[in-house]
Amino acid sequence: MGDRRRTGPTRRGELWFAATPGGDRPVLVLARDPVADRIGAVVVAALTRTRRGLLSELELTAAEDRVPSDCVVNFDNVHTLPRTAFRRKITRLSPARLHQVCRTLWASTGC
């Protein structure tokens, strides 16, 4: 399922396990494709299995999105991580799901 040859994210819509202070956690890469390869820090949104029913959450399913378990992307937890924090690629979201990511991010930020 993962691509172990890469050392960090290169494309928006990729899901990775990344080192965080709380241990390795799944994240969604939000950085634009031309930028993700060239900068030292990458903009990501955290994934969690805890659903709160918020406007700022987008549900992902194991069946449709090839994630290890059903979860949500939490756009209230957007931050940057150094490229060196990325451990293992999980999958890449489909273009249709990536469109939903952008719509949910827009709805959650209001801009």
Over which residues does each language-model region extend?
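Conserved functional hotspots at enzyme active or ligand-binding sites that engage polyanionic ligands
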Residues: 1-111
